[in-house]
């Protein structure tokens, strides 16, 4: 423990009420956040002679200050604790490295409802089905639904401005409600109801109704209609036969855990209406010496209680581990949801099968992750040896992308001991330079990236500059001129240039802009990690450049029209479904856009035509 922190004097001031405490190191950084039913009793336990673990010993040795926040209840303390953990990301807490809201399938409340993927707050009028584990699962489900139940998935701005059916109608993926006379209101509403039942897990009702309609059509000698409905029935059956369905039809989240070699995997199965919608594996950041019980307890708390995560709480949560705070967690979740949430650890029947499945998936994912980590570790060790460094814990790589000097974008990608750290990838729009001047672009991005305060844990060991000697010279100049508090001499600057044939394996590396570079054997693990991060940076830069170029392409034609500012451009593109839709629109259609007069509509029409 630090000599400067007087634990005895501090503990005399602490209350015995429930609350949250924050521990700080000498640099004023929060290193641990915890909660307690009795703050005095809990904090006193840190300053006993016989501490429970090495992790606690290491934590206490760094304490310089402790702040406490008193709360009314233990539930309030639990919620505040996880909000503080999310805010401060303390190094001695187990951290859930995921900050994305889960996607849902949204069925709008329009006259002719549409299906779409939705993330975030649920403000729009309509119904939400999910959550799904990722965007891919939603897109796959939407594609499947479009084949079985052809209701529209287009934006309202496109739907409102159609005068003839689109390609989706031609290939049988949409009933074409945008054009009058193609589908009756009753038929469209019926298909929407099928979608609603299907997404609610009521497949049997869908099949019963479809079979009844097929028989009616057949009796009325409407054989084409009967055949179409028969195909729908077969498609629904093919989908439902592939999935294990629980007899309960309940909404569950099932959480399985695996722990090995200091790494934890938490696997979550999302079950709605008795069906597995999907699953996802998480690898929380676990400080050394952490017990499995703390990993599970902290993960579950962060997963459900951090407000910005937009989690949808099921009626029941099945856990692979018995928690000491299970009752407190259930009460907190129930209070948050405004209804009863059950937390169970010893399920039976179908629930036990789900828990076994989650546990198996967690173990499999952890084995795969450890194998991948071992490969990355070997490559980074080899790279450290080549570069004569003690170790390489963090690498950053930069690349520049543009088209004939326009829409220049720089990318920065980050690797740590586990490989790509995609949450820390960044793109930088480059402005104020001569078009096509890659050196100036590199100079600008490096100054923006490193010309500011950086946490010690974020200082890279190696900075890879894609582009060879010239780009490396720019990097050296930038670092020589940096006026920063962190150790700017710590990162090793390394230039990488492709060979004459620009083939993988023929790269040349440079420590200095002058003189000859050196190459590594094609089978070198060190070269492989360099190629990996260089390719990631290249792809990230190109992706950003393409987005920027597409944005300019969609707006540049309008920017030259007098009277059409940013807000009107946005409104025009939104209502017309993009620039192409606007080009195809008549004067009368353009004039229907809010804020566009008849005179301005004529000006826009003729400007785009000529």
UniProtKB/Swiss-Prot annotation:
Function: The UvrABC repair system catalyzes the recognition and processing of DNA lesions. UvrC both incises the 5' and 3' sides of the lesion. The N-terminal half is responsible for the 3' incision and the C-terminal half is responsible for the 5' incision.
Stated family: Belongs to the UvrC family.
Domain GIY-YIG: 16-94
Keyword Transmembrane: no
Domain UVR: 204-239
Main location: cytoplasm
Localization of this protein: Cytoplasm
Quaternary structure and interacting proteins, as annotated: Interacts with UvrB in an incision complex.
GO molecular function terms attached to this record: DNA binding; excinuclease ABC activity
PANTHER family hit by this protein: UVRABC SYSTEM PROTEIN C, UVRC/OXIDOREDUCTASE
Protein name, entry field: UvrABC system protein C
NCBIfam families registered for this protein in UniProt: PRK00558.1-5, uvrC
């Amino acid at each position: 423990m630090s000599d400067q922190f007087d634990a005895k004097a501090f503990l005399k001031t602490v209350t015995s009420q429930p609350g949250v405490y924050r521990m700080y190191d000498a640099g004023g950084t929060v290193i641990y956040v915890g909660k307690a039913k009795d703050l005095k009793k809990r904090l006193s336990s840190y300053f006993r002679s016989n501490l429970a673990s090495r992790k606690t010993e290491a934590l206490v040795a760094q304490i310089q200050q402790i702040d406490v926040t008193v709360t009314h209840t233990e539930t309030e303390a639990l919620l505040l604790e996880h909000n503080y953990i999310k805010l401060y990301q303390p190094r001695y807490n187990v951290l859930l490295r995921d900050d994305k809201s889960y996607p849902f399938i949204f069925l709008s409340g329009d006259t002719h409802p549409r299906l779409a993927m939705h993330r975030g707050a649920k403000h729009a009028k309509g119904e939400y089905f999910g959550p799904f584990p990722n965007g891919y699962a939603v897109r796959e489900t939407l594609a499947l639904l479009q084949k079985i139940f052809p209701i529209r998935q287009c934006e309202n701005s496109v739907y409102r401005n159609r005068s003839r059916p689109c390609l989706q109608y031609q290939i049988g993926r949409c009933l074409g409600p945008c054009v009058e006379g193609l589908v009756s209101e009753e038929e469209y509403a019926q298909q929407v109801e099928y979608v609603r039942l299907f997404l609610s897990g009521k497949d049997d009702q869908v099949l019963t109704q479809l079979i009844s309609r097929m028989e009616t059509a057949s009796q009325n000698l409407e054989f084409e209609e009967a055949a179409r409905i028969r195909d729908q029935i077969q498609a629904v059956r093919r989908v439902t036969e592939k999935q294990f369905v629980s007899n309960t039809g309940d909404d569950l989240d099932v959480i399985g855990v695996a722990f090995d070699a200091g790494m934890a995997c938490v696997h979550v199965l999302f079950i709605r209406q008795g069906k597995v919608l999907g699953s996802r594996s998480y690898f929380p950041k676990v400080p050394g010496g952490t017990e499995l019980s703390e990993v599970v307890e902290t993960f579950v708390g962060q997963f459900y209680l951090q407000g910005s995560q937009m989690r949808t709480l099921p009626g029941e949560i099945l856990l692979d581990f018995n928690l000491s705070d299970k009752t407190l967690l259930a009460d907190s979740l129930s209070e948050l949801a405004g209804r009863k949430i059950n937390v169970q650890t010893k399920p039976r029947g179908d629930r036990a099968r789900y828990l076994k499945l989650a546990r198996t998936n967690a173990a499999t994912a952890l084995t795969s992750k450890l194998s991948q980590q071992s490969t990355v570790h070997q490559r980074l060790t080899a790279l450290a040896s080549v570069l004569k460094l003690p170790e390489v814990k963090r690498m950053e790589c930069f690349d520049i992308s543009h088209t004939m000097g326009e829409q220049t974008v720089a990318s920065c990608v980050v690797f740590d001991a586990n490989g790509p750290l995609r949450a820390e990838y960044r793109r930088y729009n480059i402005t104020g330079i001569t078009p096509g001047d890659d050196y100036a672009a590199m100079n600008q991005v490096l100054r923006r990236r490193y010309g500011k305060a950086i946490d010690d844990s974020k200082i890279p060991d190696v900075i890879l500059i894609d582009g060879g000697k010239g780009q490396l010279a720019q990097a050296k100049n930038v670092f020589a001129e940096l006026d920063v508090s962190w150790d700017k001499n710590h990162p090793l600057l390394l230039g990488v240039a492709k060979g004459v044939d620009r083939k993988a394996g023929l790269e040349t590396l440079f420590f200095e802009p002058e003189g000859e570079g050196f190459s590594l054997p094609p089978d070198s693990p060190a070269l492989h990690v360099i190629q990996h991060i260089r390719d990631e940076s290249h792809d990230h830069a190109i992706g950003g450049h393409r987005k920027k170029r597409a944005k300019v392409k969609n707006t540049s034609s309008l920017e030259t029209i007098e009277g059409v500012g940013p807000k009107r451009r946005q409104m025009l593109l939104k209502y017309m479904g993009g620039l192409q839709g606007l080009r195809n629109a008549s004067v009368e259609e353009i004039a229907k856009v809010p804020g566009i007069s008849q005179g301005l509509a004529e000006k826009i029409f003729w400007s785009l035509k000529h």
